[in-house]
């Protein structure tokens, strides 16, 4: 079994982002990715990861308003995992790899093949795209971060465009948009790192909360879902070998 610990925060209390790679115990086993809803923990990461791999996982495919879903049940007798959610539902389309199928409405035990724990900042220091978008009224433009990574094994560069937020810009300010992108955002990001969670997400540390980042606390972490950008890449390969080198910004008018 493989275990990975990504310490993006060194505080005594942190947000735990846990992801499992499991194999269904079946004659025709399905391969699944399971991510646990984030939870707060003050247990040392090294101790927590040891307990995370000693759990029993049951999976059942169900139908919901959001489409095919998986009902996850995690059983553990460890007091260390008392804060971890043990019953939750995730998207089957994201969880199952393209070659795997699960029987409908049948509860199946799974074997853990790998477990990843990422230590993020505490809950009030985390922000998502949805959090920012909800605070924008009558948006006129979108801010896209172009995050550049270098594959340290091949020296090839990959640019991942990620939607950050929508903003409202008055007509008289349109000419200064480019200047905003190169000044207010210049020192906004200190690093960006890919972590395994719900497939893959990008964690951006924000140091300057002016302009487009005014609703984000300084030194907080901004979480961006990468969606299908990296679906053909190995999670372990990407998290191990991709190094963030630069971030540029693009401000685009919202199309009708």
UniProtKB/Swiss-Prot annotation:
Record InterPro entries: Matrix_Pneumo_C, MATRX_N_pneumovirus, Pneu_matrix_N
GO cellular component, one term: host cell cytoplasm
The protein, known as: Matrix protein
Alphabetical UniProt keywords: Host cell membrane, Host cytoplasm, Host membrane, Host nucleus, Host-virus interaction, Membrane, Viral matrix protein, Virion
Pfam families cross-referenced by the UniProt entry: Matrix_Pneumo_C, Matrix_Pneumo_N
One of the GO biological process terms: virion assembly
Protein source organism: Ovine respiratory syncytial virus (strain WSU 83-1578)
Its biological purpose: Plays a crucial role in virus assembly into filaments and budding. Early in infection, localizes in the nucleus where it may inhibit host cell transcription. Later in infection, traffics to the cytoplasm to associate with inclusion bodies, the site of viral transcription and replication. During virus assembly and budding, acts as a bridge between the nucleocapsid and the lipid bilayer.
Bilayer topology: Peripheral membrane protein
Subcellular location: Virion; Host cytoplasm; Host nucleus; Host cell membrane
Subunit field text: Forms dimers. Forms higher-order oligomers. Interacts with glycoprotein G (via N-terminus). Interacts with protein M2-1; this interaction directs the matrix protein localization to cytoplasmic inclusions comprising viral proteins L, N, P, and M2-1 and mediates the matrix protein association with the nucleocapsid.
Family affiliation: Belongs to the pneumovirinae M protein family.
Any one GO molecular function term: structural constituent of virion
């Amino acid at each position: 079994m493989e275990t990975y610990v990504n310490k993006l925060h060194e505080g005594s209390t942190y947000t735990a982002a846990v992801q499992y790679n499991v194999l269904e115990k079946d004659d025709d086993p399905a391969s699944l990715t399971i991510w646990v809803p984030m939870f707060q923990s003050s247990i040392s990461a090294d101790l927590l990861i040891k307990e995370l791999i000693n759990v029993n996982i049951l999976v059942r495919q169900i139908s919901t308003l959001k489409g095919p879903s998986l009902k996850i049940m995690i059983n553990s007798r460890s007091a260390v995992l008392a804060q971890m959610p043990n019953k939750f539902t995730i998207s089957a389309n994201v969880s199952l790899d393209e070659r795997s199928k699960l029987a409908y409405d049948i509860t199946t035990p799974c074997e853990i093949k790998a477990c990843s724990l990422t230590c993020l900042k505490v809950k009030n220091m985390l922000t998502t795209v949805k959090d920012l978008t909800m605070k924008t009224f009558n948006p006129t433009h979108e801010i896209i971060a172009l995050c550049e990574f270098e594959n340290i094994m091949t020296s090839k560069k990959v640019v991942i465009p990620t939607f950050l937020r929508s903003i409202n810009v008055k007509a008289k300010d349109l000419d200064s948009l480019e200047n905003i992108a190169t000044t207010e955002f210049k020192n906004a990001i200190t690093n960006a790192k890919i972590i395994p969670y719900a497939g893959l997400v990008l964690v951006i540390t924000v140091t300057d909360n002016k302009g487009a980042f005014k609703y984000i606390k300084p030194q907080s972490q901004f979480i961006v879902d990468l969606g299908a950008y990296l679906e053909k890449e190995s999670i372990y390969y990407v998290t191990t070998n991709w190094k963030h080198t630069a971030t540029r910004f693009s401000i685009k008018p919202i199309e009708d």
